[in-house]
């Protein structure tokens, strides 16, 4: 069945950012559509001087493993029936599938006034903001005092726990990094972008309530032993792993968080960053 693309119900803070949604998306047609749209925007700017609205694509992918430009076959540990696609984004190997929120950033970096480093940091900090809001909400089941944060030495968003807390083996990475009396226990979000003539595409993937066993067949992002985590490990989440219509917005007293509520909250944060309302914080320590 072909992908279906539709406008997502959102109200960004300016008219220079459009959001679109694709459900049950096969990877190759989605990549082709991203590249086609990016090339068209580049041509309009170069040939006619036209600036087109930036686009944020919210994607629910069918199962797929993708290899970035730095991807090595040795990081694929098991061959399964899941397709393996080589792609032009940055980074190594990762998995996409239902229950994971993928957001593709089709941005004109010159128009928004960002460097590539700015964009990566905005993406990481937006995810940090929303994950940490969820961890502090009544829906949280956290008992080990965790928080989400980025690292300077490895793109993405990671979960850190207070070193004084009792951390079981299910929540402990073999690649432990200690920062400010906390210990990194795993990764919840991955990033991989491609820049072409100042325009970005590809983006971020956040594990919400997906089946993490798919990561067992790979070294996620090229890191052997990296523990992949999901929001549902620490927050009460609705069990639906694909977008559901007519879910209310996330409220401060919500005891359960849905895929759509998290998505909307993240869209709002990104839209405010795109509009210059939310500035970058100081970069995370190494």
UniProtKB/Swiss-Prot annotation:
Annotated positions for site Lowers pKa of active site Cys: 187
SUPFAM superfamilies registered for this protein in UniProt: Class II aaRS and biotin synthetases
Pfam families: LplA-B_cat
GO biological process: protein modification process
Record-listed substrate binding positions: 89-96, 190-192, 203-205
UniProt-listed Enzyme Commission number(s): 2.3.1.181
Active-site positions on this chain: 221 (acyl-thioester intermediate)
Pathway: Protein modification; protein lipoylation via endogenous pathway; protein N(6)-(lipoyl)lysine from octanoyl-[acyl-carrier-protein]: step 1/2
Enzyme class per UniProt: transferase
GO molecular-function terms, A-Z: lipoyl(octanoyl) transferase activity
Miscellaneous comment: In the reaction, the free carboxyl group of octanoic acid is attached via an amide linkage to the epsilon-amino group of a specific lysine residue of lipoyl domains of lipoate-dependent enzymes.
Biological role: Catalyzes the transfer of endogenously produced octanoic acid from octanoyl-acyl-carrier-protein onto the lipoyl domains of lipoate-dependent enzymes. Lipoyl-ACP can also act as a substrate although octanoyl-ACP is likely to be the physiological substrate.
Name assigned to this protein: Octanoyltransferase
Native organism: Psychrobacter arcticus (strain DSM 17307 / VKM B-2377 / 273-4)
Lineage: Bacteria, Pseudomonadati, Pseudomonadota, Gammaproteobacteria, Moraxellales
Gene it is expressed from: lipB
């Amino acid at each position: 069945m072909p992908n279906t693309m539709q406008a997502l119900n959102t109200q960004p803070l300016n008219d220079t950012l459009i959001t679109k949604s694709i459900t049950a998306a096969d990877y190759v047609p989605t990549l082709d559509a991203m590249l086609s749209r990016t090339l068209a925007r580049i041509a309009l700017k170069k040939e006619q001087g036209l600036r087109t609205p930036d686009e944020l694509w919210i994607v629910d992918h069918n199962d797929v493993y993708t290899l970035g430009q730095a991807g090595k076959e040795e990081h694929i540990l098991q061959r399964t029936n899941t397709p393996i696609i080589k792609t032009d984004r940055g980074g190594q190997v990762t998995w996409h599938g239902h229950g994971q929120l993928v957001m593709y950033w089709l941005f004109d970096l010159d128009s928004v006034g960002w460097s590539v480093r700015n964009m990566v940091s905005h993406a990481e900090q937006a995810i940090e903001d929303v994950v940490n809001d969820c961890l502090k909400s009544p829906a949280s089941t956290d008992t080990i005092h965790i928080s989400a944060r980025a690292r300077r030495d490895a793109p993405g968003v990671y979960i850190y726990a207070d070193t004084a807390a009792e951390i079981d083996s299910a929540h402990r990475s073999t690649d432990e990094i200690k920062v400010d009396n906390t210990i990194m226990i795993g990764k919840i979000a991955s990033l991989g972008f491609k820049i072409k003539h100042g325009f970005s595409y590809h983006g971020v993937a956040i594990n919400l309530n997906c089946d993490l066993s798919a990561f067992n067949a790979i070294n996620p992002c090229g890191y052997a032993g990296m523990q992949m985590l999901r929001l549902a490990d620490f927050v009460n989440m609705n069990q639906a792993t694909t977008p559901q219509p007519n879910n209310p917005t996330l409220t401060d007293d919500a005891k359960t968080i849905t895929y759509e509520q998290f998505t909307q909250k993240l869209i709002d944060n990104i839209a405010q960053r795109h509009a210059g309302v939310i500035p970058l914080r100081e970069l995370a320590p190494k």
